[in-house]
């Protein structure tokens, strides 16, 4: 066994800090994350440096502010001169791997993300579950199993929630499988692995068997204060009508209380899916005899408004639910 500790870096996408039972959410079903909270150190006042993906990821992978990395919004690319922690560890003799999302450069409209010298090898890239790129390794994995992502989509619950693929075909399960394969293959060497699933990022599409664990009627309504509209800028008021001010995508203003509760249940169900996959990985560490020599970091790139202040998804809104 290496005397240098292994590092398992689990980063989810758009997960609020208050989605874990051990941190006070009585509706959460997160036994494996609870174990990490109880056995480790929890940073309850940690704030990401931007409430959207790319600048936040560029910041925590370099230890520098978005204004310094010059990656200040989605669609911008991190300069090649910026050095990632994965490259530093690779230079120090660590075997570094990744499964899932990186998002340090633009990758929309079928354009594959351009990499810098990031030190990752293997690099199992899947920006999100949708098969928008031939290079999406999750899509390739589904095809190897005789599955098509579109065919795996389930029924619509309402205008805001639908069933996604069964858990065994989810991108989160694929990320866990790649992580476990790496852990077992690299035993005895110092390694660093980045697990970067897309969940619980919208769309709100948990597997049916996970949403069935939650009763939407039990979910709390978002925290909203109608009077605050009088003091907010126009772009924030527009986000209260359509999420991301994108007419036709997610009509926030038209939601009923039942719709809001259903979204909350779906979001929490996606977190439970993550929790189960984290449990698989922790079990693999134990079974391979590497648990005692592995530092496990669990975090998210930023949070989710989830209806608080009348807003869904994310954006230029500096509230705790997006930053902690």
Question: Regions from the language model: what does each represent?
Answer:
Residues 1-324:
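Formylglycine-dependent sulfatase
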